[in-house]
Every structure is written in structure tokens, then in C-alpha cells.
Design a protein with these regions (language model features):
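Active-site-proximal substrate-binding core of FAD-dependent oxidoreductases
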Residues: 257, 490-494
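A conserved FAD-binding loop/helix module that cradles the flavin
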Residues: 57, 467-489
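Helical element adjacent to the flavin cofactor pocket in flavoenzyme catalytic cores
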Residues: 212-262
Length: 494
């Protein structure tokens, strides 16, 4: 590779930003083009009555990913990002103010589970933590932080002498089934089954391998000063310091090729920009649907388009909740968890009694700072192309369902006027090709991880990253996908 080689990154989500850092460190001339006026993709904020409120991901985990990334250009994460560990991972609510806190300390959580359910469930929790750590350790460097494998290459990476450990990742069993082997109390099965939604999936269909998410959270959840968008800002700042340029508020209409090889992009303004390599940081289906031009419409020899992952309906705004003992992360459950996913994935309907997530962004130190506080409220929803409801009244319908769940949990929470509501249709328009899914394809079935697209394509010079690409959705995983894409570029260019 020569110093003059130019890389264009389409999209400034976590993956695109991570790739920009890696590529500038390797000496590439990097230009990041983003349709929005801010970086971060789904890591975003809105302003309501002069308050900045997170609208997207709110959980910061896998700190090691970002420490390593920032160190690529000689930066220390602690110097660039103000963050603090959270002693309470989440507070969970059921009927009539029944609550359970999960703590960063396993012993505290086990004691809480023993009082909430039984000593047998507390013992089951300890086994669950040990097994989820084992799964995580087996797959961290062989799958998550490595290029997309096939089943055989994964066995080689793990090692034939550790085939037993690979079998214990439980990809052949569903998360919902395996949780019943640890917990007798159905509420605990519900609580830990929710980890499937972190990858946009149903616990009834996703492999039990996703237990590893429990260990990811147990290893640390941090609160970021300034919200998750401060992470995106820090990534942009680091990339810019090494020479990456950013063109915000500009859309790419097409990726161009010459003699079968990528040679640049055309912007919505009609400007042709030359490039030696192009990285697409967006939903892979945008390529498949021809939204970036016919010449790159078939990025893979075999095209897989499985079931879409979950979408969401969100409200970002101010709430009145002085009498509600909220934590920073709160989950409000209804009694029939499987019905939620059957309605979403099989009927394309909103759940009658949805699980409600409330991120009370002013509660990190306990207590309520004022009569009004910032919050993100979220429920799961079907993607646009599977939805069987009327988009015109879906927000009001969903709000009534949320209020019913809040009341049933015995909480006094009022969403004030002036909030910003986003629906599957909004997400579909903001992230082309996604159909409103926030996670790419659903992780349903034992082969889902191998069907997810890799960073390389069959078109020379074209790469991809993001939540719809290996290793999967979520800010840390999308960040890893960007790094993997950059490493693939560097390796292929020599």
C-alpha cells in the first residue's frame, strides 16, 4: 500500500468510525461520508426543552474493545471519555412494585435472587454466571474479535483439543429452554431471556450461546458523561486528529465500479469521488436492494436474507417520576413473555402488554434531581415489512400499552408533552434497507451466526461493517466489525 491510497467510508456509525481510526493509523487517506448532520448512527440525541436526551443505545459495555481501538492511535480511553462504573446493572419490575436489582457484584445479585425467589435459584444464578463466562471466553477471540468463520474454521480456531468447550456454547439449544435448567422462578427466566433482545431476537428462537451477554454485562456496565453520543464524538475526534476527513449531511447515491472493481462513489449532489477501497457502514440489505447501485447489488455469491430482527417504538423526553424509585436502567415486565415475541415475529403485531425499558438518565447517583427528568422509553416492535398494524396510529396505541404496564407495576411515571417519538417507519427511513430493524437479521437458529454477512464481499475493493454484519449488532460488536473490515482491507491491499 502507498500513502496515496484513498478509502471512502459510507456511514459514521460505530463501525465506520472504528474503521476510520484503524485505516488512518495504517496510513490511508480516509474520507467518511455521513447522510446525517452528526456522527454515531443510532448513537444519537435529541434536544427537548434544552435537555439533551439519548435516543438510541444506552448501555456501554466491552470496554476493552474501545481501549484497544483508541490505543491504535496512541490515545488513552480514560482521557477521551468520562465514564463511571454502575453498581446496579438494571432494576427489574413486575406486578405491584415487585423488584429485583442485578448488581455488578455477583454475590450481591445472588443474595438478591435468593430473597426474591429461592436459594435454589440463587445457586442456579451462580452456575449461570460461570457458564456464561465460559461461553464468552471460548468465543471472544475466536468469533467476536475475528473474521467471520464457517463451522469448521471455528473448530480450528478454538482447537480440536477444546471441542468440548465449543459444544458447551449450546448453539443447538434455545436460550429459553436452557434458562429453565438454571431457574425455577419464571420471572428469572424472563429476566435473563431478555438478553436475546440485545441482538433483536426472540429468546424462544435464539441459541443459548447468547448467554454470553450476561457475562459481558457482569464484566462491567458504564455510564458515559454526555450519553452514548459522547463515545461517537470521541471516536470522530481521534480519527480526525490522525487526518480522517468527515463530510456530514451528505448522502451517497451509488458505489461505482470499473472493470469489476470498486473505484469510488457518487454523492446525491452528483459529485464523483475516487477511491481505492470503499467501506459501507449500513444495513447490508441496502446493497442487496440496489440502493447503492446495480454494480454492487450482489456483494456475495450466495445471498441470505433471513428474518429481520426487532424494531422499536421509542419516546425520548422529560418524565415526571418523583415518586418512582427508578434506577438508571429499568425493565418493566408483564406476565406472559413468550406472547410478546409470538405477536411480533409471527403475527407482525405490537404486543398487548409489552416489556417496557426506561433509561432514567438523571438517576445515575440515585434519587430524582427535579420534578422533570430525562428518559428514553422503549418497547419492541416488528420491522416495517412484517408489520400488520396501521403506522398512522401506532404511536398512540403503543403509548396506551406502555401506560398500562407502568400502572400494573405500581409506578407513577408520566411522559410529558414535547417528547420525540420514533416508530419502525422512522427507523426504516433513517437507515435505508433496514426495514426499521435496529439489529440486522434476527439471530434465530444455530446457523444464524454463520449466515450473517462477513466484512469482505466478492467485489474487489468493497467491504462492509455495522450491526447487520459479523460479528453482530450492538455498539461494541459494530465497532469490532469496523475494525475487522479495516484489517481485511489492509491485509488484502498488502
Amino acid at each position: 500500500m502507498t500513502q496515496s491510497e484513498r478509502a471512502i467510508v459510507i456511514g459514521a456509525g460505530a463501525g465506520g468510525l472504528a474503521a476510520a481510526i484503524e485505516l488512518t493509523a495504517a496510513g490511508y487517506d480516509v474520507c467518511v461520508i455521513e447522510a446525517a448532520n452528526t456522527v454515531g448512527g443510532k448513537m444519537n440525541q435529541v434536544v427537548v426543552e434544552d435537555h439533551r436526551i439519548d435516543t438510541g443505545p444506552t448501555v456501554f459495555t466491552m470496554r476493552w474493545v474501545f481501549e484497544s481501538l483508541f490505543a491504535t492511535l496512541g490515545y488513552n480511553l480514560d482521557d477521551e471519555l468520562h465514564h463511571s462504573a454502575m453498581p446496579i446493572l438494571a432494576r427489574h419490575w413486575w406486578h405491584n412494585k415487585t423488584t429485583l436489582d442485578l448488581h455488578a457484584d455477583i454475590d450481591q445479585s445472588a443474595d438478591a435472587i435468593g430473597q426474591f425467589a429461592s436459594s435454589a435459584d440463587a445457586a442456579g444464578y451462580r452456575r449461570f454466571c460461570a457458564d456464561s463466562e465460559s461461553i464468552h471466553d471460548t468465543l471472544r477471540d475466536t468469533f467476536m474479535a475475528a473474521q467471520k468463520p464457517n463451522p469448521l474454521s471455528l473448530v480450528h480456531r478454538v482447537g480440536w483439543h477444546r471441542i468440548g468447550a465449543l459444544m458447551q456454547t449450546r448453539s443447538h439449544q434455545t436460550l429459553w429452554h436452557v434458562l429453565s435448567q438454571y431457574f425455577r422462578d419464571p420471572r428469572l427466566q424472563q429476566l435473563f431471556g431478555r438478553y436475546a433482545t440485545y441482538v433483536g431476537s426472540s429468546p424462544l428462537q435464539t441459541p443459548a450461546t447468547l448467554m454470553l451477554i450476561a457475562h459481558v454485562e457482569q464484566a462491567g456496565v458504564w455510564r458515559l458523561e454526555g450519553g452514548m453520543s459522547s463515545l461517537a464524538d470521541a471516536m470522530q475526534r481521534v480519527a480526525s486528529s490522525a487526518g480522517a476527513s468527515f463530510r456530514l449531511g451528505e448522502r451517497v447515491d451509488a458505489i461505482t465500479t470499473r472493470a469489476g472493481r470498486v473505484d469510488g462513489v457518487i454523492t446525491a449532489a452528483g459529485e464523483k469521488l475516487q477511491a481505492d477501497v470503499v467501506l459501507f457502514n449500513g444495513d447490508n440489505r441496502a446493497l442487496l436492494q440496489g440502493l447503492l447501485g446495480q454494480s454492487v447489488q450482489r456483494p456475495d455469491r450466495l445471498q441470505h436474507s433471513g428474518q429481520r430482527g426487532l424494531s422499536a417504538i421509542t419516546w425520548s423526553g422529560l418524565i415526571s417520576a418523583q415518586q418512582a424509585p427508578l434506577s438508571y436502567h429499568n425493565v418493566l415486565f408483564q406476565e406472559d413473555y413468550p406472547s410478546e415475541f409470538k405477536r411480533i415475529f409471527h403475527q407482525g403485531e405490537l404486543p398487548h402488554k409489552p416489556t417496557v425499558y426506561v433509561c432514567a438518565q438523571d438517576r445515575e447517583r440515585g434519587g430524582c434531581p427535579s420534578a422533570q427528568e430525562r428518559a428514553l422509553v422503549l418497547i419492541n416492535a416488528p420491522s416495517v415489512d412484517t408489520a400488520a398494524f396501521n403506522e398512522d396510529n401506532v404511536a398512540e396505541q403503543a403509548k396506551l400499552a406502555v401506560e398500562a404496564v407502568i400502572d400494573r407495576c405500581g409506578l407513577d411515571i408520566k411522559l410529558n408533552a414535547g417528547h420525540v417519538c420514533r416508530t419502525p417507519q422512522w427507523y426504516s427511513e433513517r437507515f435505508p434497507g433496514s426495514g426499521g430493524s435496529l439489529y440486522g437479521g434476527a439471530s434465530h437458529g444455530m446457523w444464524s451466526s454463520f449466515i450473517r454477512p462477513g466484512t469482505r464481499t466478492r467485489i474487489p475493493g468493497l467491504y462492509r461493517c455495522g450491526g447487520s454484519v459479523h460479528p453482530g449488532p450492538g455498539v461494541p460488536m459494530a465497532t469490532l466489525s469496523g475494525r475487522l473490515a479495516a484489517w481485511a482491507m489492509i491485509e488484502d491491499r498488502g
